[in-house]
Design a protein with these regions (language model features):
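Short, conserved structural patches
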Residues: 2-3, 62, 66-187
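Alpha-helical assembly-interface signal, strongest on the long, hydrophobic N-terminal helix that forms
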Residues: 1-88
Length: 187
């Protein structure tokens, strides 16, 4: 047998032995599947955190609308407390990308809804007199509604599964509880 043929036969023998070897299969499977499992784990974490922030965001909108609807007259200190309550609801998540707006919407005799007053934290308050489109069934002539709005810009911390920023918004309308409308006094 020539030296080249012997070398080929040796290579073929080693390849056959390698093909029959079973001792390292578990380690190879683990090495192949580990990145997939890490991505699934981190993705579950990021999505779970996004869902929790979305739930808190909705609760914050409900909180500001509920608190404002209990007043007959809201002064500046009261509004500071109402808007501040929303940041407490958002804990433990950062409130830097979070904004909250609370407004009163009044519906005239023709069913046209406009902003009566509006205040905001980390955002822009709505303009007084601005026209608003209400959800179906809410534009009862002569009615006043308290409108709580929140917005949170969620940026996943790891960015493996969710990349970029996602804007999470919530809104709720509530009727004033103790008066036909809630006054807003700047003092």
């Amino acid at each position: 047998m020539s030296p080249a043929a012997a070398r080929r036969a040796g290579i073929v023998t080693r390849l056959r032995a390698f093909g029959r070897e079973r001792r390292g299969i578990a380690a190879i499977e683990f090495a192949v599947l580990l990145p997939l499992f890490l991505i699934l784990y981190l993705g579950t974490f990021e999505v779970g955190q996004g869902i929790a922030i979305k739930l808190n965001n909705g609760l914050a909108a409900r909180t500001v609308a509920d608190l404002a609807s209990q007043y007959t007259n809201i002064y500046n200190a009261d509004m500071t407390n109402i808007l501040g309550a929303s940041t407490t609801v958002m804990a433990p998540y950062p409130t830097q990308p979070f904004s909250v707006t609370v407004s009163e919407v009044t519906v005239d005799d023709k069913g046209n809804a406009t902003i009566t007053w509006s205040d905001s934290l980390n955002g822009t308050a709505r303009s007084v007199g601005q026209s608003v489109t209400l959800p179906a069934g809410m534009n009862t002539p002569g009615a006043s509604l308290i409108w709580g709005e929140t917005q949170y810009v969620y940026t996943p911390g790891l960015g493996y599964v969710l990349t970029g920023s996602i804007t999470l918004s919530s809104q709720i309308f509530m009727s004033p509880r103790n008066a036909p409308s809630v006054l807003r006094t700047n003092s």
